[in-house]
A protein has these predicted regions:
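ATP-binding N-lobe of GHMP and related small-molecule kinases
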Residues: 1-71, 89-98, 263-271
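Short beta-strand segments
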Residues: 6-8, 117-119, 126, 143-147, ...
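Short beta-strand-to-loop capping motifs
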Residues: 35, 146, 235-239
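DPxDG-like acidic metal-binding loop motif
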Residues: 73-97, 118-120
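Alpha/beta catalytic cores of group-transfer enzymes, especially the acyltransferase/condensing modules
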Residues: 95-139, 208-211, 217, 224-225
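Acyltransferase
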Residues: 138-220
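Glycine-rich, charge-dense phosphate/pyrophosphate-binding loop(s)
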Residues: 182-271
Length: 271
């Protein structure tokens, strides 16, 4: 038996959608699982995910990592998704995203990135459940990916135990608007929605590109958000100006890798 599975990068939160909104991106990690005399590394996150659904004994695992680690692009969620889908296929179990999500959150801890990595497209999550709201986003994501890394744990430790009621109310309103923007595919509403006071103000110190991007947006850009817990920043632009915006950002932010992504309608799947 040989299994090959791929899983996409993801961008989570999308402004006010803290821990509940994410989209799959067209950058892929892969795994090849071969039946034989393999000696699996049981400490590997993907192997641990596989083991939730199928035995690892006698199998070898070869992971190909293209998603940069600890940059806010869902690298750990992609690895978990690889293991879950491969494990489900190996055990002849249902690989439905919501069923796999229930298994995977015990490794990931939160569902947003993992939901999008499993289901593809644009997803909202709650209580380990998924609603896939669209194949695409109303705006094009251009990532500013720095060399610096930030662990999810460190980013979460920067969050306060409580926030002012006004900030919570503001973010709840924008999160509701984000849902409407996604459902309608409206770039104008999307640009109004991607503002947050719940997590980004507290994480900004570890992601200096966020304020820099907001102060140097290309003409017509809709805004900028942290990707996941950062430090990668997503600049959101309209489709018609995406190429020009990418070139402008690349000239301004030479200290970062500037990558224009497409949303992947496909999640983790065999290849």
């Amino acid at each position: 038996m040989t299994l090959r599975v791929r899983a996409p990068a993801t961008t989570a939160n999308i402004g006010p959608g803290f821990d509940c909104a994410a989209a799959a991106l067209d950058l892929w990690n892969e795994v090849e699982v071969v039946e034989g005399d393999g000696d699996a590394d049981e400490s590997h996150l993907g192997v641990r995910a596989f083991a939730l659904l199928a035995p690892t004994a006698g199998k070898s695992f070869r992971f190909t990592d293209r998603i940069p680690r600890e940059r806010g692009l869902g690298s750990s969620a992609a690895v978990i998704a690889l293991g879950l889908v491969a494990g489900a296929l190996a055990a002849d179990k249902d690989p439905a995203p919501e069923k796999l999500l229930a298994e995977g959150v015990q490794l990931e801890g939160h569902a947003d990135n993992l939901a999008a990595a499993l289901a593809g497209g644009v997803c909202l999550t709650w209580e380990n459940r998924i609603v896939r709201v669209a194949d695409n986003l109303p705006a094009v994501p251009i990532a500013l990916v720095p060399e610096a890394t930030v662990s999810t744990a460190a980013a979460r430790n920067s969050l306060p135990d409580s926030v002012p009621h006004a900030d919570a109310a503001f973010t709840a309103g924008r999160a509701a608007l984000l849902g409407a923007a996604l459902a309608q595919g409206s770039a104008d509403l999307f640009g109004e929605a991607i503002h947050d006071r719940l997590h980004e103000p507290y994480r900004a110190a570890k992601a200096p590109l966020l304020e820099a991007a907001r102060s140097n947006l290309p003409e017509g850009a809709l805004g900028a958000t942290l990707s996941g817990s950062g430090p990668t920043v997503i600049v959101w632009v309209r489709e018609e100006s995406a190429a020009a915006s990418e070139a402008e950002l690349a000239s301004r932010f030479t200290e970062a890798s500037v990558v224009r992504f497409a949303v992947s309608p496909e999640g983790a799947s065999p290849v």
